[in-house]
């Protein structure tokens, strides 16, 4: 028999199915607007702020806000690797803390190894998947 409190919560919060979709555009640089190219370049520059002594994989993110501001983030590893912070979360948390009511319109992600920037988009970290 189900405890009354649990049964009551199930009836109170009718379960429903929600579907969330995300669209990702993979473009060549010549297909981007000038503003979008600025955001990509900001993401590349943000790689310079990465602290990635363990993975040697620097990730930079730039977010374009609806008011035209750009917020950046980079991955931050620590001695408890791999439980650092990914660049996406750093940028999103910073945007949320500094501009909580301003929507994000665009996210650009750049990844760099010791050989240079990756030629293909990188996958999200394990925490973001």
Residue positions per predicted region:
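Methionine residue identity
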Residues: 1-2
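Short beta-strand scaffold segments in enzyme catalytic cores
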Residues: 56-65
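Zn2+-dependent cytidine deaminase-like catalytic core
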Residues: 72-129
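Intrinsic-disorder-associated, low-complexity terminal segments enriched in Asp/Asn/His/Tyr and depleted
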Residues: 6-11
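Charged, well-structured alpha/beta interaction segments
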Residues: 52-54
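Short, compositionally biased leader-like segments
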Residues: 12-41
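Short Pro/Gly-enriched beta-strand edge/turn motifs at strand-loop
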Residues: 41-48
């Amino acid at each position: 028999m189900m405890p009354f409190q649990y049964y009551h919560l199930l009836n109170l919060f009718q379960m429903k199915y929600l579907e969330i979709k995300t669209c990702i555009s993979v473009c060549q640089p010549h297909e981007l607007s000038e503003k979008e190219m600025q955001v990509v370049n900001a993401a590349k520059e943000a790689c310079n702020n990465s602290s990635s002594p363990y993975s040697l994989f620097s990730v930079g993110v730039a977010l374009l806000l609806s008011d035209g501001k750009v917020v950046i983030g980079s991955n931050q590893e620590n001695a408890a690797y791999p439980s650092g912070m990914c660049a996406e979360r750093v940028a999103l948390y910073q945007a949320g803390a500094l501009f909580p009511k301003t929507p994000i319109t665009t996210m650009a992600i750049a990844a760099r190894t010791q050989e240079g920037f990756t030629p293909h988009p990188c996958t999200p970290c394990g925490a973001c998947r």
